[in-house]
Amino acid sequence: MRTSISLVLVGLAALAVAQRAEAHPHILVDAHVKLLFDQRGDLTAIANVWDFDEAFSAYAIQGYDSKGDGNPTRKDLQPLADINMDALKEYHFFTRVSSGGPPAALGAPTDYWDEFTDEKMKLHFTIPLKQPVAVRGRTVTVDVYDDEYFAAVNFPADQATAFADEPAGCSNLIRRPERLDATIARQLAQIPVTQRELPADLHAVTDRLVNAIVVQCP
């Protein structure tokens, strides 16, 4: 069985138990995503800002507040960011880039840090691709999700596809998953925090809860 996602995110086995021990998902994430392109128009990296829910955030920052005023600095939180990146690597950062073949290989994260603002922890990080992905004449999809649904990763309502130096003439769309059926949601709510992997029938459902950015270029 893989490492608990609570360990992935904060390195504390007690975290999810203290917050949402009774239900999947245990952590809520709003993922803001920007696609980065080089001068040739190839996709080179994905820049991310993840906003965690307030309950999770309040617990996650405990022990990292050097001033004791409830507002840890970016410097305070850097050890936590190091833990985040090292552990999320096992899950490919909940990110998959594909263009019809096998998923693109991801490199080591760069420009990463945590901040605490507006009662939420925000994780900033950029994932470079080991090799640029050509987008001309093809459809490229960037999926962002946790297939085990321990963390519910969503594109926020105001998320618009954000490009940096994108090729001219490209179109894009945001694709969000359908709402969970109430019966499935109740079944997920009965799964304890200690169970990372879902039963096959439920995994078949959560594996479709994919947020995607779909890019098409002439």
Language-model regions: role of each:
Residues 1-5:
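Positively charged n-region of N-terminal signal peptides that target proteins for export
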Residues 6-16:
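Bacterial N-terminal signal peptides
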Residues 18-20:
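N-terminal signal peptide c-region/cleavage motif recognized by signal peptidases
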Residues 100-218:
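Mature, soluble, non-transmembrane domains
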